């Protein structure tokens, strides 16, 4: 990690190592866990300031999922689940509350508000898991100065007396979508596969 980590203050190294252990050179688990851990920085990363997790597509709704989770949205808009309407906003409303994304977007700085709104309406995929590696402290600082004041404003709207997985972690889910938007707007990221390590199955 010497060549890549030299771009970071020491305070960020723990986070970088955390992500490296979960970003393998391929998607499928074809061996033991240790064989999937990156032992060095891939050469493909060298010309990029930002590494993001691969995008997840959210436009493949099954009828059973629509009936179970999306019926409230469907009742409000019978055309909501047409293929052309299956975007980030729809996904967020189904799992994290109708109208909550718009409430949050309305609290963004003027320079980001409508661009992020368009991102949620036009995109049906995003870089998931709130995971990124950044070699530019200037870029990272700009991102933090954008996202954290916004999330603090959101706290005044949503509070912390929240219930259910989708709403209890709403700040993380908002940040996940915003991260994908922001780094794709202000940099040219390189994406890398993500896998999940299930301790009940993979030890």
Model segments located where?
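ER/Golgi luminal nucleotide-sugar-dependent glycosyltransferases, focusing on the catalytic module
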Residues: 1-203
């Amino acid at each position: 990690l010497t060549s890549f980590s030299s771009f970071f203050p020491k305070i960020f190294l723990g986070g970088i190592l955390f992500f490296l252990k979960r970003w393998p050179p391929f998607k499928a688990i074809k061996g033991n866990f240790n064989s999937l851990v990156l032992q060095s920085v891939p050469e493909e990363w060298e010309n990029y300031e930002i590494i993001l997790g691969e995008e997840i597509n959210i436009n493949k709704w099954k009828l059973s999922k629509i009936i179970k989770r999306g019926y409230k949205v469907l009742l409000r808009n019978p055309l909501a689940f047409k293929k052309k309407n299956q975007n980030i906003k729809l996904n967020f409303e189904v799992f994290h509350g109708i109208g909550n994304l718009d409430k949050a977007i309305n609290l963004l700085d003027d320079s980001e508000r409508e661009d992020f709104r368009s991102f949620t309406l036009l995109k049906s995929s995003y870089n998931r898991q709130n995971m990124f590696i950044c070699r530019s402290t200037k870029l990272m600082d700009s991102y933090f100065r954008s996202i954290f004041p916004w999330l603090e404003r959101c706290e005044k709207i949503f509070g912390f007396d929240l219930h259910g997985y989708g709403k209890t972690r709403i700040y993380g889910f908002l940040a996940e979508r915003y991260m994908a938007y922001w780094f794709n707007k202000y940099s040219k990221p390189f994406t890398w596969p993500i896998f999940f390590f299930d301790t009940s199955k993979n030890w």
